[in-house]
């Protein structure tokens, strides 16, 4: 995390929301000041007491993914789309990394396609001026479904069921956004 100048608490928030059920939190969003109490109260999900090494290995694996997705080096496997996220939303934008961490079970084809979906969603959040709290709430709600996606076919079904209707609702107010 130090190599990308990232705050550990931000990673922990995204790690937890990407990998575990946070639906009991307000809007499904775990705040930084709630992380330690959430962990203390959710061993049943994390199983850090029963399987501490597996929990740490999962966290270590996701740190490496987080850094990899943040740097998005090379043009292979859809990394161009992750690079474009930074160009669209700015260097400080990192909300999409929560989605990328949730996508860790996807096969290579699905993951490459998912990076393109993420780029498109970020484009629509920027162009439609969707607030950060709405974007974060939306992304957090998608994580539980994204965790179960393994193939391009199941990704297509998720996009049709969840992403397209959400983006369409954001586009409803396009004319007024362009006139501002």
Question: What residues fall within each predicted segment?
Answer:
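A cross-family structural signal marking well-folded subdomains
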Residues: 1-180
